A protein has these predicted regions:
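Alpha-solenoid HEAT/ARM repeat scaffold
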Residues: 14, 33, 53, 72, ...
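Hydrophobic residues within the alpha-helices of tandem HEAT/HEAT-like
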Residues: 1-6, 23-24, 38-46, 62-63, ...
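Eukaryotic acidic, Ser/Thr-rich intrinsically disordered low-complexity regions
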Residues: 212-234
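Alpha-helix N-cap/helix-start positions at coil->helix boundaries
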Residues: 25, 29-30, 64, 68-69, ...
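HEAT-repeat alpha-solenoid elements in large eukaryotic scaffold proteins
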Residues: 1, 29-39, 68-78, 107-116, ...
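Eukaryotic tandem repeat interaction scaffolds
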Residues: 108-109, 118-170, 174
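HEAT/HEAT-like alpha-solenoid repeats
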Residues: 10-24, 49-63, 88-102, 127-141, ...
Length: 234
Protein backbone atom coordinates (compact mmCIF):
# COMPACT_ATOMS: atom_id res chain seq x y z
CA UNK A 1 0.00 0.00 0.00
CA UNK A 2 2.93 2.33 0.56
CA UNK A 3 3.52 2.48 -3.20
CA UNK A 4 0.01 3.82 -3.87
CA UNK A 5 0.98 7.51 -3.58
CA UNK A 6 3.88 6.88 -5.97
CA UNK A 7 2.00 5.06 -8.73
CA UNK A 8 -1.09 7.28 -8.70
CA UNK A 9 -4.84 6.77 -8.66
CA UNK A 10 -5.31 4.84 -11.92
CA UNK A 11 -2.66 2.20 -11.22
CA UNK A 12 -3.69 1.94 -7.58
CA UNK A 13 -7.22 1.06 -8.67
CA UNK A 14 -5.95 -1.34 -11.32
CA UNK A 15 -3.28 -3.19 -9.33
CA UNK A 16 -3.47 -2.41 -5.61
CA UNK A 17 -7.20 -2.58 -4.89
CA UNK A 18 -7.74 -6.09 -6.32
CA UNK A 19 -4.89 -7.34 -4.10
CA UNK A 20 -6.39 -5.56 -1.11
CA UNK A 21 -9.77 -7.22 -1.72
CA UNK A 22 -8.13 -10.64 -1.63
CA UNK A 23 -5.71 -10.09 1.24
CA UNK A 24 -8.32 -8.54 3.56
CA UNK A 25 -9.95 -12.00 3.58
CA UNK A 26 -6.71 -13.74 4.55
CA UNK A 27 -6.90 -15.96 7.64
CA UNK A 28 -3.66 -14.50 8.99
CA UNK A 29 -4.49 -11.74 11.48
CA UNK A 30 -1.12 -9.99 10.99
CA UNK A 31 -1.67 -9.65 7.24
CA UNK A 32 -5.08 -8.06 7.74
CA UNK A 33 -3.74 -5.68 10.37
CA UNK A 34 -0.91 -4.51 8.08
CA UNK A 35 -3.50 -3.66 5.43
CA UNK A 36 -5.75 -1.84 7.86
CA UNK A 37 -2.91 0.17 9.43
CA UNK A 38 -1.88 1.40 6.00
CA UNK A 39 -5.28 2.52 4.77
CA UNK A 40 -4.14 6.12 5.15
CA UNK A 41 -1.78 5.53 2.23
CA UNK A 42 -4.77 4.75 0.02
CA UNK A 43 -6.56 7.83 1.31
CA UNK A 44 -3.76 9.95 -0.18
CA UNK A 45 -4.60 8.64 -3.64
CA UNK A 46 -8.29 7.69 -3.83
CA UNK A 47 -11.48 8.83 -2.13
CA UNK A 48 -11.77 6.68 0.98
CA UNK A 49 -15.58 6.63 0.91
CA UNK A 50 -15.55 5.28 -2.63
CA UNK A 51 -12.97 2.73 -1.54
CA UNK A 52 -15.10 1.55 1.39
CA UNK A 53 -18.17 1.24 -0.82
CA UNK A 54 -16.08 -0.83 -3.20
CA UNK A 55 -15.03 -3.02 -0.28
CA UNK A 56 -18.60 -3.85 0.75
CA UNK A 57 -18.83 -7.06 -1.32
CA UNK A 58 -15.67 -8.35 0.39
CA UNK A 59 -17.00 -7.39 3.82
CA UNK A 60 -20.31 -9.10 3.06
CA UNK A 61 -18.45 -12.19 1.87
CA UNK A 62 -16.47 -12.40 5.11
CA UNK A 63 -19.52 -11.81 7.30
CA UNK A 64 -21.48 -14.58 5.53
CA UNK A 65 -18.64 -17.11 5.36
CA UNK A 66 -19.61 -20.61 6.51
CA UNK A 67 -16.43 -20.87 8.58
CA UNK A 68 -17.15 -19.08 11.86
CA UNK A 69 -13.47 -18.31 12.41
CA UNK A 70 -13.45 -16.41 9.13
CA UNK A 71 -16.59 -14.51 10.15
CA UNK A 72 -14.91 -13.68 13.43
CA UNK A 73 -12.06 -11.85 11.65
CA UNK A 74 -14.06 -8.84 10.58
CA UNK A 75 -14.11 -6.72 13.73
CA UNK A 76 -10.85 -4.82 13.28
CA UNK A 77 -11.82 -3.90 9.71
CA UNK A 78 -15.20 -2.57 10.80
CA UNK A 79 -13.67 -0.48 13.59
CA UNK A 80 -11.24 1.17 11.18
CA UNK A 81 -13.99 1.79 8.63
CA UNK A 82 -16.06 3.44 11.37
CA UNK A 83 -13.16 5.81 12.00
CA UNK A 84 -12.41 6.79 8.41
CA UNK A 85 -15.74 6.49 6.59
CA UNK A 86 -18.49 9.02 6.03
CA UNK A 87 -21.06 8.48 8.80
CA UNK A 88 -23.97 8.09 6.38
CA UNK A 89 -22.14 5.44 4.34
CA UNK A 90 -21.22 3.53 7.48
CA UNK A 91 -24.74 3.50 8.88
CA UNK A 92 -26.34 2.55 5.57
CA UNK A 93 -23.89 -0.15 4.54
CA UNK A 94 -21.80 -1.45 7.43
CA UNK A 95 -23.93 -0.96 10.54
CA UNK A 96 -26.44 -3.63 9.35
CA UNK A 97 -23.57 -6.14 9.27
CA UNK A 98 -22.61 -5.20 12.84
CA UNK A 99 -26.20 -5.55 14.02
CA UNK A 100 -26.63 -8.93 12.35
CA UNK A 101 -23.54 -10.32 14.09
CA UNK A 102 -25.31 -10.01 17.44
CA UNK A 103 -27.49 -12.99 16.50
CA UNK A 104 -24.79 -15.14 14.91
CA UNK A 105 -25.21 -18.87 15.71
CA UNK A 106 -21.71 -18.96 17.24
CA UNK A 107 -21.32 -17.70 20.82
CA UNK A 108 -17.77 -16.40 20.28
CA UNK A 109 -18.97 -14.12 17.50
CA UNK A 110 -21.96 -12.86 19.47
CA UNK A 111 -19.72 -12.12 22.45
CA UNK A 112 -17.13 -10.33 20.34
CA UNK A 113 -19.90 -8.38 18.63
CA UNK A 114 -21.12 -7.11 22.00
CA UNK A 115 -17.68 -5.70 22.72
CA UNK A 116 -17.45 -4.24 19.22
CA UNK A 117 -20.82 -2.53 19.61
CA UNK A 118 -19.56 -0.68 22.68
CA UNK A 119 -16.47 0.46 20.76
CA UNK A 120 -18.66 1.66 17.91
CA UNK A 121 -20.92 3.51 20.33
CA UNK A 122 -17.93 5.35 21.78
CA UNK A 123 -16.93 6.38 18.25
CA UNK A 124 -20.33 7.08 16.69
CA UNK A 125 -22.70 7.84 19.52
CA UNK A 126 -25.83 9.67 18.53
CA UNK A 127 -29.57 9.22 18.06
CA UNK A 128 -29.10 7.31 14.80
CA UNK A 129 -26.82 4.77 16.49
CA UNK A 130 -29.07 4.37 19.51
CA UNK A 131 -32.18 3.92 17.38
CA UNK A 132 -30.63 1.21 15.19
CA UNK A 133 -29.23 -0.68 18.16
CA UNK A 134 -32.39 -0.50 20.26
CA UNK A 135 -34.56 -1.60 17.36
CA UNK A 136 -32.44 -4.75 17.13
CA UNK A 137 -32.40 -5.29 20.90
CA UNK A 138 -36.19 -5.06 21.07
CA UNK A 139 -36.42 -7.88 18.55
CA UNK A 140 -33.72 -9.92 20.30
CA UNK A 141 -35.38 -9.55 23.71
CA UNK A 142 -38.47 -11.27 22.27
CA UNK A 143 -36.52 -14.09 20.63
CA UNK A 144 -37.58 -17.68 21.25
CA UNK A 145 -33.91 -18.50 21.76
CA UNK A 146 -32.73 -17.82 25.29
CA UNK A 147 -29.19 -17.51 23.92
CA UNK A 148 -30.25 -14.47 21.91
CA UNK A 149 -32.08 -12.98 24.89
CA UNK A 150 -28.97 -13.62 26.95
CA UNK A 151 -26.90 -11.74 24.37
CA UNK A 152 -29.00 -8.63 25.03
CA UNK A 153 -27.89 -8.72 28.66
CA UNK A 154 -24.27 -9.44 27.78
CA UNK A 155 -24.23 -6.44 25.46
CA UNK A 156 -25.68 -4.19 28.14
CA UNK A 157 -22.98 -5.38 30.55
CA UNK A 158 -20.40 -3.90 28.16
CA UNK A 159 -21.96 -0.48 28.74
CA UNK A 160 -21.36 -0.83 32.47
CA UNK A 161 -17.60 -0.87 31.93
CA UNK A 162 -17.56 2.91 31.52
CA UNK A 163 -18.72 3.92 34.99
CA UNK A 164 -18.82 7.62 34.15
CA UNK A 165 -21.07 7.44 31.09
CA UNK A 166 -24.27 5.65 32.06
CA UNK A 167 -26.85 7.93 30.43
CA UNK A 168 -27.52 5.74 27.37
CA UNK A 169 -27.67 2.62 29.52
CA UNK A 170 -30.08 4.16 32.01
CA UNK A 171 -32.40 5.75 29.45
CA UNK A 172 -32.45 3.24 26.62
CA UNK A 173 -30.94 -0.08 27.77
CA UNK A 174 -32.11 -0.53 31.35
CA UNK A 175 -35.74 -1.25 30.34
CA UNK A 176 -34.50 -4.44 28.67
CA UNK A 177 -32.93 -5.53 31.95
CA UNK A 178 -36.17 -4.82 33.82
CA UNK A 179 -38.03 -7.07 31.41
CA UNK A 180 -35.46 -9.86 31.14
CA UNK A 181 -34.97 -10.09 34.89
CA UNK A 182 -38.25 -12.05 34.78
CA UNK A 183 -37.08 -14.32 31.97
CA UNK A 184 -38.07 -17.98 32.26
CA UNK A 185 -34.44 -19.10 31.88
CA UNK A 186 -32.31 -18.82 35.06
CA UNK A 187 -29.11 -18.01 33.11
CA UNK A 188 -30.73 -14.86 31.73
CA UNK A 189 -32.00 -13.77 35.14
CA UNK A 190 -28.58 -14.47 36.62
CA UNK A 191 -26.82 -12.14 34.18
CA UNK A 192 -29.51 -9.52 34.77
CA UNK A 193 -28.72 -9.76 38.48
CA UNK A 194 -25.12 -8.76 37.82
CA UNK A 195 -26.21 -5.71 35.83
CA UNK A 196 -28.86 -4.62 38.33
CA UNK A 197 -26.57 -4.89 41.33
CA UNK A 198 -23.72 -2.97 39.69
CA UNK A 199 -25.99 -0.28 38.25
CA UNK A 200 -27.61 0.22 41.65
CA UNK A 201 -24.16 1.06 43.03
CA UNK A 202 -23.04 3.27 40.15
CA UNK A 203 -26.13 5.23 39.18
CA UNK A 204 -26.82 8.77 40.37
CA UNK A 205 -30.37 8.67 38.99
CA UNK A 206 -32.87 8.27 41.83
CA UNK A 207 -35.52 6.62 39.66
CA UNK A 208 -33.02 4.11 38.30
CA UNK A 209 -31.72 3.34 41.79
CA UNK A 210 -35.28 2.82 43.02
CA UNK A 211 -36.07 0.44 40.15
CA UNK A 212 -32.82 -1.45 40.72
CA UNK A 213 -33.62 -1.95 44.39
CA UNK A 214 -37.08 -3.20 43.53
CA UNK A 215 -35.58 -5.71 41.10
CA UNK A 216 -32.99 -6.74 43.68
CA UNK A 217 -35.76 -7.57 46.15
CA UNK A 218 -37.52 -9.67 43.52
CA UNK A 219 -34.37 -11.49 42.44
CA UNK A 220 -33.47 -12.31 46.04
CA UNK A 221 -36.67 -14.35 46.14
CA UNK A 222 -35.89 -16.19 42.90
CA UNK A 223 -36.47 -19.95 42.87
CA UNK A 224 -33.05 -20.59 41.34
CA UNK A 225 -30.20 -20.61 43.84
CA UNK A 226 -27.65 -19.35 41.27
CA UNK A 227 -29.77 -16.27 40.61
CA UNK A 228 -30.06 -15.58 44.33
CA UNK A 229 -26.31 -16.03 44.71
CA UNK A 230 -25.63 -13.62 41.81
CA UNK A 231 -27.82 -10.86 43.23
CA UNK A 232 -26.41 -11.18 46.76
CA UNK A 233 -22.76 -11.75 45.86
CA UNK A 234 -22.22 -8.85 43.42
Amino acid sequence: LSVAPKIGEARTKEYILPLFHELIKDEDHDIRMVLIKNLDKLNEVINIDSFVQGMLPSIDEISENKNWRTRNQIEETIIVFARITNRKIFFENIMPICIKRLTDPVYAIRRKSCKMMKKLYDMLRGEDFEKKLCTKLTSMAKSDSYLIRLTVVLLIKEFLIDEYDLEFLEKRLFPYISKLSNDKIPNVRQECSVVVRKLERLSKNRDVIKECRSLIDELKRDKDIEVVYAITDN
